[in-house]
Structure formats: C-alpha cells, structure tokens
C-alpha cells in the first residue's frame, strides 16, 4: 500500500497547508510547472519526489526532471507528463503513448483545472490535480492525496482553497 500526494502547477509557491495535507503520504508526485529548483528541492526534502518539468520550468528544472515519466508502484503502471489533455481530448502524441504503453494511471497538469476521470475506452484513471500554486487564472488552489493498494485506487481526498481567501 502506498499513500501518494499529487500536485501540479506550483509556480514557485508552496502554501503552508500543502505540508499539513501531505504529512502522512509516502511520496509526492508533481505534474510540472514546478517553478524553480528551490521549490522542487523543498518538496524533495519533505517527501520522496517524482516529478516532470512543465512549460514554464527553466533549464535547471528541465535537467533534473524529465518531460515524461513512466513508473510502476504496487500493481499500477503510471504515466505522468505536464501537458496532455483528458479523456476525449488528449493531445495526439499523448493519446499515442496512452494507447501504446497502456498505463493504469495517467497524470498531467497545465490546465489548472482539477479533474479525476476514469477513461473507460483506454481503461485508465486520469488525474489532473489542478493548480497548487497561486499564479494563473484558476480560482481554487487544489491538490490530491490517495492510496494505491495493489491495483486499487482508494481514499482519494481533495484539498481545495479559494485563492481569494488569503488564508495562506
């Protein structure tokens, strides 16, 4: 059993509530637009970090974190990238990868819109955790934690905070 925290689009901002929400997870998975290497290091010093770079990340972050990441945890094959779309609206190159690699879990960011959708056609769970940072057009700061037990995804919880609340 593995407890994971899933986030994206921090854009150099780590709100204090993030650390409390993720305090009991085993790993953090960041789907890009980290912002800078200091943000990545802060996350990696807090919990083991798996991450991909995003379109706003500089060369230092890009040298440390790949564009695409494939890995296996429990009995689940995971594919993570920053820009990729969602069921019925995948980017062509991502759709090709999903059809060829057949991951059980596909994670992306970029849109700043939280989505958790099961794709019946490709038999995978798609997660976009939304935006964990405060830069962008989104109205809510969001991120996710869940448990992976064998091939089962369970105990999924969403953190959501109105950006205008200024309680961070």
Task: Place the predicted regions along the sequence by residue.
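Helix-adjacent hinge/juxtasegments
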Residues: 50-100
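Conserved beta-sheet core of the metallophosphoesterase superfamily
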Residues: 50, 89-152
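N-terminal active-site segment of His-dependent metallophosphoesterases
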Residues: 1-49, 57-70, 75, 139-142, ...
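Short, solvent-exposed aromatic-acidic interface loops
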Residues: 156-168
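Active-site neighborhood of phospho(di)ester-bond hydrolases with catalytic His/Asp-centered motifs
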Residues: 6-8, 27-33, 50-55, 79-82, ...
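Beta-strand-turn-beta hairpins that frame and shape the catalytic cleft
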Residues: 1-5, 70-79, 119-125, 148-157
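Short active-site segment of divalent metal-dependent hydrolases/proteases
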Residues: 12, 36, 85, 113, ...
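Residue-level detector of flexible, active-site-proximal loop/helix-junction positions
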Residues: 11, 87, 133, 150, ...
């Amino acid at each position: 059993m593995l407890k994971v925290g899933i986030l994206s689009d921090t854009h150099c901002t780590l709100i204090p509530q993030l650390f409390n929400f993720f305090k009991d997870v085993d790993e953090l998975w960041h789907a890009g637009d980290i912002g800078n290497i200091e943000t990545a290091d802060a996350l990696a010093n807090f919990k083991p970090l798996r991450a991909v770079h995003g379109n706003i990340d500089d060369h230092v972050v890009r040298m440390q974190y790949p564009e695409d990441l494939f890995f296996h945890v429990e009995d689940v094959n995971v594919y993570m990238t920053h820009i990729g779309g969602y069921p019925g609206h995948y980017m062509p190159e991502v759709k090709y990868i999903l059809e060829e690699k057949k991951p059980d879990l596909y994670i992306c960011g970029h849109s700043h819109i939280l989505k958790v959708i099961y794709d019946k056609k490709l038999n995978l769970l798609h997660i976009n955790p939304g935006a964990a940072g405060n830069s962008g057009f989104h109205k809510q700061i969001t991120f996710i934690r869940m448990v992976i037990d064998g091939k089962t995804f369970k105990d999924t919880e969403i953190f959501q905070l109105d950006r205008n609340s200024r309680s961070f």
